[in-house]
Each structure stands twice: as structure tokens, then as C-alpha cells.
Amino acid sequence: MKRTPLFEKHVGLGAKMVDFAGWEMPLYYTSIFEEVMAVRKSVGMFDVSHMGEFLVKGPEAVSFIDFLITNDFSSLPDGKAIYSVMCNENGGIIDDLVVYKVSPDEALMVVNAANIEKDFNWIKSHSKNFDVEILNISDTTALIAFQGPEAQETLQELVEDSLEEIAYYSFRKSIVAGVEALVSRTGYTGEDGFELMLEAKDAPKVWDALMNLLRKIDGRPAGLGARDVCRLEATYLLYGQDMDESTNPLEVGLSWVVKLDKDFVGKEALLKAKEKVERKLVALELSGKRIARKGYEVLKNGERVGEITSGNFSPTLGKSIALALVSKSVKVGDQLEVAFPGGKLVEALVVKKPFYRGSVRREV
């Protein structure tokens, strides 16, 4: 299994290590519950160095990325980032990603760990007609997420630039704990926070400095378990669970990142799909504390209407919550049932998204 540059730090903190997409990663350090609460009330810190980073350089870098992704990258100012998906020719989602516009001829793409090789090969295969160079810098890049309502105030102690001046989905290159880093106001938790992209060799030093800050405020390191709970509470989608190449962005509530007034791979398929969207992703609150798993059937009046894509117990809400891909006829307020193994049916109410709205900044 692969290890991030912070592996020894996790082991030293007594983390429960697990295999995630071929990476040995911390599931939790003390408990998922405590780590979720730290993110919600103060700060949680995540090692997300398993994510993939691609550097795209050249005079046609912007137009190339604009062709690859469904969102509008061409009009993005320097120093801004954008969330999007990449689709195949059939409109199926290859991956979701964040793209940073560094300059008119340079951009950074951050992709999911399980898709690094697939994405890189797919991106390269579409580059023939563009004057660009594509570098996979994943192995030499570390990524640390510092998330929670006290993130800005706490992190500022170690950052030379003013964090208040970094708007949501903006970034700048700065010095963090004496080390060069790209600091972005982004995250996957539903809280305000920052992600620090830096050279892998510098990661342990920065991690130690951040740990010292956490000890002052009752913050804590957080593992993949807390990350998954936080993202589900905030109703952020997870690739491979809530979406994949068998789903298109219009079905899973991502039509806001699809700009059909520009050209991109999969546009024609999505124009057709827009005429006839048969499924949608909905939020469910289940009765009781049992956790609905991916693939469990969802029923309405005894008839199958879809299936669970993600489920977990929400410590923040004190409820079992889930996302489900269901028939378009299902609406907020509907009473459904989830079929658990053994035939047990558990009641589930369709609720508005998101389940939880935290301190995350809304203005871009």
C-alpha cells in the first residue's frame, strides 16, 4: 500500500490505519464522534495527501481545461478555484475535482485518490490538439485540510498572508510555518477552513506546527471516518458512492456545475439527457440508528424507487442519514422505506438538502 509523507505522524498518534484506494490512511485517532465534533466546534485537521494533483502548463492551459470540465474555467480570474466534474462522451462522470487557476498559462487540478491513474490517462488522451504540458505531481505534493469555525483565527498564527483576504474558493501562495505553500479557502466538511498544498518533504514540519496550534484550542487531527461523516452531513458527494460513470451530473444534483453554453467533452450527451432526467439524488433521515449502506433498496408504498448511495450516523444531528438515487417522482416530505439485509424495512423521510449547514463561507 502507498503511504503519505505523514504516515509516521499518524502511527505516532496511535491512529487506526486502513486501506483506502490503495493508501494506508488514518480512519480515526481517538474516535470518529470526537473528531467530527472538533470539526464542527473548533478545528479538525486532515491529511488528504492521497489526493491527486496535476499541473497543466502552456499557452492553451485554460482553453484545454475548459474543454475537459463541465464548469466555466475560461472566465475564472487568477487566484480562484472552481469545483466541477469531467464527463465521458456519454455524459457519465469520470471524476469530480477542484481546479485552481494559477495564471493564464498554468492551472492545478486536484482529483480523487482512486482515480489518479484513470484521470491522468484520460486527460492526456484529450491533449493532442492543445499546446499544453501535463505533469502528475501527486507523489511530490502533500495536502493538509484545516477545517472548522476556528480555522482562520487559529491558522493565522502560522501564515504570513492575511487569511481574511482569501475569499471562499480563492487561494494564494504564502509561507506557512516557514514553508512555501498554496493556501486555499476550500474544504469537504461544510465548515470554514483551508487546504494547504505543499511539497511532500515539508509536510511533517508543517503538520507538527499545526498540531501545536490544535492543542491550544481543543482541536484535533481527524481521520477519513470523520471526513466521510462531515461531507455527508454537508451533503457533499463522494465519487464511487454517489456518482460514477453510470450517472450524469444532472441526476445527482450537480447541474449547477454544467455550463451548456460552452463546449466540453460529453456536452452533446448531456444536452440530450437534460430533456429526460429520470432519476435524482435525495437526502433521507432514517428512523432509529441503523446505518443504510450503498446498494440498499429504497421503497415507496412497497414499490422499488431507487437505492442508497451513501449512509452514516450523524453525530451532529443525532440521526441516521443517507443519500439515495431515486425516481424523479420522489419529493421532499415523502415517507419511504429502506430495505436492510434480512428483509427489515426502516422508515426514511425525504428532507431538504443539505442535512447540515456549517460555518462554510458562501460568497465565492
Curated annotation (Swiss-Prot):
Keyword list, A-Z = Aminotransferase, Transferase
EC top class named in words: transferase
Keyword Transferase present in the record's keywords: the answer is yes
What GO MF annotations does this protein's record show?
aminomethyltransferase activity; transaminase activity
Pfam families per the UniProt record, alphabetical: GCV_T, GCV_T_C
Concerning its family, UniProt says:
Belongs to the GcvT family.
Q: Provide the assembly information.
A: The glycine cleavage system is composed of four proteins: P, T, L and H.
Record's protein name: Aminomethyltransferase
